[in-house]
Amino acid sequence: MRRMNELMKILGQTGQAMTFDQIKIQLASSEQIRSWSYGEIKKPETINYRTFKPERDGLFCARIFGPIKDYECLCGKYKRMKFRGIICEKCGVEVTLAKVRRERMGHIELASPVAHIWFLKSLPSRIGLMVDMTLKDLEKILYFESYVVLEPGTSPLKQFSLLTEDQYLDVMDEHGDDGIEVGIGAEAIKKVLERIDCKADKERLRQELKDTTSEAKRKKLVKRLKLIEAFADSESRPEWMIMDLIPVIPPELRPLVPLDGGRFATSDLNDLYRRVINRNNRLKRLIELRAPDIIVRNEKRMLQESVDALFDNGRRGRAITGANKRPLKSLSDMLKGKQGRFRQNLLGKRVDYSGRSVIVVGPELKLHQCGLPKKMALELFKPFIYSKLEKYGHATTIKAAKRMVEKERPEVWDILEEVIREHPVMLNRAPTLHRLGIQAFEPVLIEGKAIQLHPLVCTAFNADFDGDQMAVHVPLSLEAQLEARVLMMSTNNILSPANGKPIIVPSQDIVLGLYYLSLETPEFLATPDRNEYDAEGRLTVTGASSFATIGEVEYALSAGAIKLHDKIVARFDTVDAEGKPVRQTVITTPGRMLIAQILPRHPAIPFSLINKQLTKKNVSDVIDAVYRHCGQKECVIFCDRMMGLGFRHAAKAGISFGKDDMIIPAEKKVLVERTAAEVKEFEQQYQDGLITAGERYNKVVDAWSRCTDEVQAAMMKEISRQEVGKVTNSVWMMSHSGARGSPAQMKQLAGMRGLMAKPSGEIIEQPIIANFKEGLSVLDYFTSTHGARKGLADTALKTANSGYLTRRLVDVAQDCIIVEDDCGSERGLTVRAVMDGGEIVSSLSERILGRTVAADILDPATGEVLFKRDTLIEEAQAEKIEKAGVESVLIRSVLTCESRVGVCGLCYGRDLARGTPVNIGEAVGVIAAQSIGEPGTQLTMRTFHIGGAAQRGAEQSMVEASRDGHVTINNRTIVHNSQNVPIVMSRNCEIVLTDDKGVERARYRVPYGARLLVEEGAAVTRNQKLAEWDPYTLPIITEHSGTVEYLDLIDSITLVERMDEVTGLTSKVVVDYKQAAKGVDLRPRLQLKDANGHVIKLSNGNDARYFLSPDSLLSVENGAQVSAGDVLARIPREGSKTRDITGGLPRVAELFEARRPKDHAIISETDGRVEFGKDYKAKRRIIVKNDETGEETDYLIPKGKHVSVQEGDFVRVGDPLVDGPRVPHDILKVLGVEALSDYLVNEIQDVYRLQGVKINDKHIEVIVRQMLQKVEILEPGDTTYLIGETVDRIEFETENTKRLNMGERPAQAMPVLQGITKASLQTQSFISAASFQETTRVLTEAATAGKKDTLNGLKENVIVGRLIPAGTGSVMNKLRAIAAGQDRQRLAQARPVVSKAD
C-alpha cells in the first residue's frame, strides 16, 4: 500500500477525502510533534535578502521543508526528475516536488516548558481543573510571580499553597532540609500534572461525589470528574497541556512574498515565530552562561508570553502589534470568525466558470430559459469551445483555437450555439435566503451585456429590475448538469418549500392584466341573461349575445361588435372524467373566454374556476389546481401563456394613476369632529377624577385609532363604488387585484395619516388628521419624520438580524435528514384548528394536509374508520375529514419520530416543494431553517409597546359572535350584581359557539369580572355581543353581600391617599410596604363580615378574604355595605408602556433561543388548592396543596407581581399563578413535549401570520426537535452518568438498552430544551460546532475529550470536501460504503502478490 501511495504522489493524486470514516482530535505529545517534524528550526532568519534563498535552519529552510523549485536542490547540483528522492550532500535538500513545502512541518525545541494558552485560559481552565487551582493562582505561578509548594515534606506548609519571593527565601532557610519541594513556572505545573493518576483520581472523585451534600461542591466535583474521565478514556496525558517543543507549520502556509521595490509582504505568523525563536535562543544562552536566577526567570516569562501570542494573540494581556499598530493574526485568529479558515475557505469558496451581470426583464422567454449575453457565454464556455473547434478541425492546437476565440471568428459563434444547446446554467441572486435563490435555466444567446430573467421567477429570487445583479455558474460534469436539469430547473420548482403553495405566481402587471380581463362591470351586472320580448314578440330588453365557439368570440371582439366586459352566453369545450369532450354553456364575458382558452382541459378544472374577478389570490388558486390535477408540464405551459395574456392586456387596458382617482370621503369631517368631541369628554372625565391619567391616554389613543379605521373604510367604500357608465377607479383596481398598493397606503393618500409613534415607541395622542392629497402642515410633517427615519434604520438592522437568525437555524438543523421510510413510532401530536379571538385562523384541513395519520380517524357521527393509520392526507382526504366534522386528528410528527439519526419519511409527510411523499436523503433540516429564516426580513423589528406605533387596534373589551350558532359556557361561575347582570367569577371561563350539528365553530376566553350578556344554550346571531368588560383594569369582585373590613391596611404604611395634581381628587392606593417595622408581617387584604360580625364563608369553604397587591385602587371604604358582584378594588393595567409585547423578529429569535421572557408567568406544577404561606424576605409564598395526595408545592413570587389567583382557588396543572408570557422550559417540564411543541408552533406562527407569511408547521417542528436533542440525568442508576449532566438523547437510550440487557438499573432523565445557539454548539460533531461560533472553546473541549467526528451532518462533510450525505450524495455514500467493502475483500485476497512487487 505504501508503494501505491507514493505512486499516487508522483501522479499528483494525494490523499483523497474519501479514504477515512471519522476524524479524531486530541492533544499531541512531544513525541508526536517530533514525529511530524522534518527538523528543528534554530534561527529566526527567513530568507537571504541578496540571494532570496532561504537561510539554513531558519524559518524557511529548504533542508527541513523541501526544495523551492520542483525537482531541484538549492545549490543546483541536482536538477530534473531522474534524481528524484536523492538528498544533495552539499546543501542537504531532498530532490522532490516543491509542494512538499505545503505539508512538511518543523519544530522548535524550547529551553523551558510553556503552558498551552488554550488549556489555560479557555474557561473553565483545563489545567486549573486538573491541578485543582484557581486560574488566578495558576497565572501567578506560570508567569513567575509566586512559588508553589509541590511537596510539603515534613514542614507545616500545605500542598499547592503559594509563596511570594520573600516567603520562599524564608521557607528555604527554615525547612530547606525537610524534604520540601517548591517550584515556579510551567516546570512546576508540569511536575504536578505528571503525578496525576487519572484512573485512581476517577474512583476517588466518584466516591467523594457520593458522600458530598453541598450543591456547590457537587458541581465542582462533577466538572473535575468529567475532565479526568475524558483524559482517562482518551489515552492523552494531562502533562501534554504543557509543551516542551512547539510545531512550526509548513512555510507555504505562512508565505513571504516579494513585492516590487524590494520589500516583502509576510504572514503575521512569521513574526510571531521569530519572537519565540529569538527568546528561546536567548534563554538557552542565559542558561549556559549560568545567569542570575531573576534574569532567567524573566526570559522564561517572556518565552511563555511569546508562545501565548503565537497560539492566541490578545487572549492574555495586550495583543502584540505589528509595524502598523494592528494586532498580529495568531493561529487561533486564522480559524475564528467570518474571515477565518472555516467560514471563509471551507464553507464558502469562490468558484471558476462564473460571471455576474445586471439583470433585465425577458418577457418573451419561456419559463425554463434565461437570456445570456454572447460575450459572457463565450468566456464561460471557453474550454468546451476549444474542444469542439479541435474536434471539427477548425483548429489544430489549443493555441490556434484560443486565437480564433479571441478574434471572435464567425465559426466560433456557431460552435458556441451548439455547445450551449441543452447545457443548463445556474443563476443566483444574493442574498440566497432559500434554495430557490439558485435555479437552473437553459441559456438563450442574446446581444447586449445584461442577463435576461423570466418575470415569473422574480418572486422566488426576490429580484426586481432596478439594478439588481445576478451571478451565472456553469455546471461542468455530466452529473452536475443532470442534477441542475432534474432538481434545479426553474420548471421543477413551481411550489414553495415553505408552504407548498405555488411560488411561480403572476404579480404586478400580469395580475392587473388578468384582473382587467375578468372584470365585472356594473353594465355586466345590469345586463339580463337573455333577450326579453313583449307579447307581440318585439325586442324590449337586449340581453347577452350568444356565441357558439371561442373563435366567434374573438372574431366579434376584433370586429368591435362586443367589448371585453360585455355579458355573453358562450360554449366552453372541456372533457369529462373519461376524457370524452363535453360542451357546457356558460354566462361570462369575452375577457374571461380569452383566459379560458389557455386553461388546460381537465374534469377537475371547471370554467367556474376563472369565471370570476381574478385577484392575485384567485390566480394562485388556479395555478395550484392546474398543478395538482394536470401535472407539472401542463402547469408550466399554462403559466407562460398566462403571463403573455396578462402583459398584453395590462398594456391594452391603459390603467393609470391620477390624483383624482384618490377620493377623500365626505364623512371624514364628521368622523373627525365626533372623535374630537369624545376625546374632550375623556379629558373632562379625567378632570372629574373618574379615570386615571393612564386610562385617559389609553381611551384617547383608542378613539383616534378607531376613527382612522372608520375614515379608511369610508374612503375604500367611496373609491370602490362602481356606477353604470363610469369607468372603474384605476387605483382601486390596482389595489384590489393585488398588483400594487394596499388600503393602508391609500389611507395615507386619501384618508387620514393617523397616529404616529415617538422615539420611545409610545404613541403621540395627537394624530395627523390630514392626508397627502390635502397636504401636511409643518407640525404634521415634523411629527411624521421620526417614524419614517426609524423605518429606514430598522430595515438595515433587520437584514443583519434576519440573516443571523437563518444562520443559527441552519446550523442547528443541518444534520436533520430523512434516513428511512418508517420508524414505526406509535406516538404523534394531536392537531386541531387554531382559533384566535373566536375566528378560525388556520383550519384543521390546512394543518393536517400532507401529514401522516398516527391513529385511525373515526367519523364522529357513525364511528366508522375514515382513514387508517399511516395514510398520507391529500387535499381530497383533508376535505372529507373537515366535512365529517372531526375536531382533532392525531398525526405523526418529526417531534415524536423514533429514528436514531435524522427522521423518517412517514413522520415528516409530504415534501412540500414536490407535493409527493418525501424522498430518503432529503435535507429537511436545512429546508426548515430556510423556510423560517427567509421571510425574516419581512418581519418587523419593533418591540411593540402594547401594539406599536399607529398599528394598535382598540383594546379588546367585548366578545362578539363571529357567526350564528348556539352558546355553551364552560367553567361558568357567576354572581348577579345589584343590576342583576351576571358577572363572571371564574378565571378560565370560555364561551363556545356550536353550529346546528353541534360542531364547535368558535371559542372565546372571557376574563374574570366580565358581564355575561347571553345565557347557556341561547341561539345567537352574527356580531351579537356575548360579553363585555373594562379593558383597562383588573377588578376584584365580591361574591357575597356583607360589610367590608380592612385588614393590615395601615395608613402611610400599606395604604396612601394619592392626590392627582390635575384634578385634585384623591384615591386610596395600596403601596409596597418595605418601610414597615421589622417583624410585622403585613398582608393587606379586605374581608367580608355578615350582620353578626362573623367572617362570611365562601362556597369553597374558605373565609371571604381578598388579598391586595401593590398599586391596587380601593373602591370601597372601611365598614361599607356591599352587595354580591360589586367591585371592591381594581388594579389598573398600565396603558401605553405596560408589558412590552416583543413582536416580529426579536420574538421569533427569543422563542428559538428558548430565553426566559421578562416578567414571565409562573405556572402550577400540580392540581390543588391555593394557599398563601408565610412571606420570605421580599417574596410572597404561594402553596398549592393537592387534596388527594396531600402534597404541597411552594412557589416564591416577588412582591410587586400581580398574583392572578385568590386563596382557596382550585388550579390545574399548567394554570398560571402569576400572569405573563409563559416560559417554554416550564411548559416542557410540567406539561410535556406535545404541549411545548403546541406552544412554540403557535407562538411562532402568530408572528408570521401577522405579516401574512405562511409557513408549514412541520418546519417549526423540525427545529424544535433539534432543540430537544439532550436529556438531563435525574437518577444515574448503574450507568456512569452523573446527576444533572446533560447527555445526548440517542447516546442515553443506547446506554440504557445496554444496561437493561446486562440486567442492571437504567438511568432516568428528563428532556431539556436548549436554545438554537446552545444546541448548535453542543452537536455531536465538533467540526460543525467549531465552524459555527466560539471556535477555540469548542476545539479545546473536543481535544481534551479526544472527540471523534463521524461526519454525519452536512456541514462537516462540506468542510472535509466530500459530497454531503443528503440528496444525490446520500445514494453515493451508500454505494461508496458497499464499494469500499468489496475493495477490502479483493485487497485481502490479493495481498501476497503486492509483497512481491515490493
From Swiss-Prot:
Q: How is the cofactor bound?
A: Binds 1 Mg(2+) ion per subunit. Binds 2 Zn(2+) ions per subunit.
Domain of life from the UniProt record:
Bacteria
One GO molecular function term? DNA binding
Q: Which residues bind Zn(2+) 1?
A: 73, 75, 88, 91
EC number of the protein: 2.7.7.6
Which family does this protein fall into?
Belongs to the RNA polymerase beta' chain family.
The protein's role, per its UniProt record? DNA-dependent RNA polymerase catalyzes the transcription of DNA into RNA using the four ribonucleoside triphosphates as substrates.
| Name by which UniProt lists this protein | DNA-directed RNA polymerase subunit beta'
From what organism does this protein derive? Gluconacetobacter diazotrophicus (strain ATCC 49037 / DSM 5601 / CCUG 37298 / CIP 103539 / LMG 7603 / PAl5)
